[in-house]
Amino acid sequence: MDVTQNISNNNKFIKFQNEGFIVEENFLDHNILLDLQQQIQLVFWTQVVNNKLDKKVDRFEEGIELLFSENYTVFKNCGKHIQHLIDVWKLGVSKKIINYLMNVCKLQFPSICTRPVVMFSSKTLATNDIYHTIPFHQDAKSMQGSDNAIVVWFPLQHTTEDLGPLQIIPKSHKKGIIAKEIDEFGFGYVDSNLYNVEDVKSLTCKLGDIVFFDSKLIHGSGNNISSLIRWSCQYRYNDLLDRTFIEKGYPHPYLYRPMKEEEMK
């Protein structure tokens, strides 16, 4: 790495430490993201066709909404399978992202905290408000990871204000973990009296933009008032050489197990 690049990385790190987040514009290859979006949609559309719903709709969005209402179990299964697409995982461990975590965010020994999360947010595809508009919370509460843990987020389309973009509160990571207990959906919500709504910043990112933020940063999602689905991906990383993480004994709070038949219905 040349001196100029090293200085640039250090300046970005200083900004990241102060603000708690950094947005890198046009960081990811558009073609890779568009291909990933097609793969995700193919999973749902395959079941739209299999359930003989394709003849009743003109657009993909109509098809997935019909699948949601006609066969929710299959819809939910599709939602689970898109979390495990190979290209979703490949992006999370790509050299470009890992190098950024190490060279800019200064993770010494990055490790994956939990599986990737592919989010699809729309009021027409939700059984609970939490599935389309997530209140302000801190990921650090549920991660229980390293003190310098990082969350990476990026959209799979241009995300305008109407789509309900990622919303963050700059510098809120400096408050430490102030979220209360984790709820049934796995979120550590922050009481509204602990932050100022006037400080909220909406990140209207374009396709290819990516956001790196401190896991303690207070954030949530805007309200998607459009007729479109907001697609995005999120990844979480710990630092196995972080002293606090070492002293805590490397807790890993995520439970992976096969589901019982009654749970799958």
Where do the model's predicted regions map?
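A structural signal for well-ordered alpha-helical segments within the folded catalytic domains
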Residues: 95-99, 150, 206
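Non-heme Fe(II)-dependent double-stranded beta-helix
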Residues: 1-18, 25-136, 142-143, 255-260
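A structural signal for short, well-ordered beta-strand segments
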Residues: 116, 152-154, 233-237
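Active-site rim elements
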Residues: 85-90, 195-201, 220-222
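Catalytic core of non-heme Fe(II) oxygenases with the double-stranded beta-helix
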Residues: 102, 129-203, 242-253
